[in-house]
Amino acid sequence: MRISIFAVGRLKSGPEKDLAARYIERLAKTGPAIGLEFSRVIEVGESRASNAETRKREEAAMLEKHLADGAVLVLLDERGKALDSPAFASLFGDLRDSGKRDLVIAIGGADGLDSALYDKATAVLNLGKLTWPHQIVRILIAEQLYRAVTILSGHPYHRV
């Protein structure tokens, strides 16, 4: 199963981008052995519309252009379901085992995600009750994807 991260906003050069890239590189090296291949990061620009609803709609349209037919869409949103790392890994393992070819994890802009994306989503997850800057969310999801691969492969990176 190919895994992609779609994000509203561009991650500028710096330590956040470097750390996210480090976890993505680890994921890309270890995932294929268990059927999880990192595909790509798609970044779309933030809308400049004057109101939040229009911005969310425009950003969703930009993200949807890159969404393959039949892709499983997982949204990251503060109102989503909280999972621990083993449950997160299990979700992806189950999707892989069910024959899904493409998985997209979407990170919204400052205003969140448009309802059109919620209608297409298989799951909506949160990264806890705290509010995180988008740069940190990118690091957190990259690390959790790598952690999920290590859990599914029995690697000792994740310890309970």
UniProtKB/Swiss-Prot annotation:
Q: Major location, coarse class?
A: cytoplasm
Please name one Pfam family that this protein belongs to.
SPOUT_MTase
The record's Gene Ontology cellular component field reads: cytoplasm
Q: Which InterPro entries does the entry link to?
A: Alpha/beta_knot_MTases, RlmH-like, tRNA_m1G_MTases_N
- What would be an example GO MF term here? rRNA (pseudouridine-N3-)-methyltransferase activity
Give the enzyme's main class according to its UniProt record, as a single word: transferase
- List the keywords (alphabetical): Cytoplasm, Methyltransferase, rRNA processing, S-adenosyl-L-methionine, Transferase
Q: Which residues bind S-adenosyl-L-methionine?
A: L76, G108, L127, G128, K129, L130, T131, W132
Q: What is its EC number?
A: 2.1.1.177
Q: Where can this protein be found?
A: Cytoplasm
The record's section on Gene3D superfamilies has: 3.40.1280.10
Q: Which domain of life is it from?
A: Bacteria
The protein's annotated catalytic reaction(s) are: pseudouridine(1915) in 23S rRNA + S-adenosyl-L-methionine = N(3)-methylpseudouridine(1915) in 23S rRNA + S-adenosyl-L-homocysteine + H(+)
Explain the purpose of this protein. Specifically methylates the pseudouridine at position 1915 (m3Psi1915) in 23S rRNA.
Subunit structure as annotated in this protein's UniProt entry: Homodimer.
Q: Which family does it belong to?
A: Belongs to the RNA methyltransferase RlmH family.
Q: What is this protein called?
A: Ribosomal RNA large subunit methyltransferase H
Species this protein is from:
Agrobacterium fabrum (strain C58 / ATCC 33970) (Agrobacterium tumefaciens (strain C58))
The gene behind this protein is rlmH
